[in-house]
Swiss-Prot record:
GO terms for cellular component: early endosome membrane; Golgi membrane; retromer complex. This is Sorting nexin-3. The keyword Transport applies. Pfam families: PX. GO terms for biological process: endocytic recycling; late endosome to Golgi transport; protein transport. The gene is SNX3. Required for retention of late Golgi membrane proteins. Component of the retrieval machinery that functions by direct interaction with the cytosolic tails of certain TGN membrane proteins during the sorting/budding process at the prevacuolar compartment. Binds phosphatidylinositol 3-phosphate (PtdIns(P3)). Residues 34-54, 62-84 have a biased composition (Low complexity). PROSITE patterns: PX. One of its GO terms (molecular function) is phosphatidylinositol-3-phosphate binding.
């Protein structure tokens, strides 16, 4: 027999296995579905009178509201085309002051005092009757002021009678087939030397020259236009 008691032997054994406490296995956790990024959806547009570009999208740009809703909307400025040809008749003339007023803006210093880029002023005035009996006729003074290069003189004054205007119009029709030449005032057979008839004819000749001399095709393509308006020695027999 061993010299040590049995209970002392088992207690002193260093390799004796200790009793194992049972632990249940961990329960499996339910699996979460994988994360899926939702596609970007644009929010519907909502109209707002105070802020017409407002949307429900938090990332959209929001326009700031107007400072005051009582301010009336301003209409766009009126664009006025400045004609290079100014009519000399005071009832039909359009000055730079009138054009600035029509445009809705104050007139500038340059518009008040500068010379227009191109202008043409024609005036028929001072009718005079010459001769006696059947040889009586009336001629008119044509005053022309311009800075258009097509005209040789900046200021000129010549006298023409009605028959000169008739020849001038016929020559223009032959020279410029693409331009419709306006008619002359009609002939008068009774009381043609009265003041009323002469004034009516003067106004008709004035309108005729304003249309003809202001036409750009006639200014550059006609040879008789400048000569008729500015040459004192103009003779219709040289052009017929």
């Amino acid at each position: 027999m061993s010299a040590y008691p049995q209970d002392t032997y088992f207690n002193s054994n260093p390799y004796q296995q200790q009793p194992y406490a049972y632990q249940p296995p961990p329960q499996p956790q339910p699996q979460q579905p994988p994360y899926q990024q939702q596609p970007y959806q644009q929010q519907a547009y909502q109209y707002n009178a105070q802020q017409p570009y407002q949307t429900t999208d938090p990332y959209a740009y929001q326009q700031s509201p107007p400072q005051s809703s009582t301010v009336p909307p301003q209409s766009p400025p009126v664009q006025v085309t400045h004609s290079p040809f100014i009519r000399t008749d005071s009832s039909q003339a359009v000055s730079f002051t009138d054009m600035a007023r029509m445009a809705g803006r104050p007139q500038t210093f340059d518009e008040m005092y500068s010379v227009p880029e191109s202008f043409l002023e024609i005036e028929i005035r001072n009718p005079m009757t010459h001769g006696i009996g059947r040889k009586m006729y009336t001629d008119y003074e044509i005053v022309c002021m311009t800075n258009i290069p097509a005209f040789k003189l900046r200021h000129s004054a010549v006298r023409r009678r009605y028959s000169d205007f008739e020849a001038f119009r016929d020559i223009l029709e032959r020279e410029s087939t693409r331009v419709n030449i306006p008619p002359l005032p009609g002939k008068v057979f009774t009381n043609r030397f009265s003041d009323e008839v002469i004034e009516q004819r003067r106004e008709g000749l004035q309108r005729f020259l304003e249309i003809v001399a202001g036409h750009p095709l006639l200014q550059t393509g006609s040879k008789v236009l400048c000569a008729f308006l500015q040459d004192p020695a103009w003779d219709k027999s040289q052009w017929i």
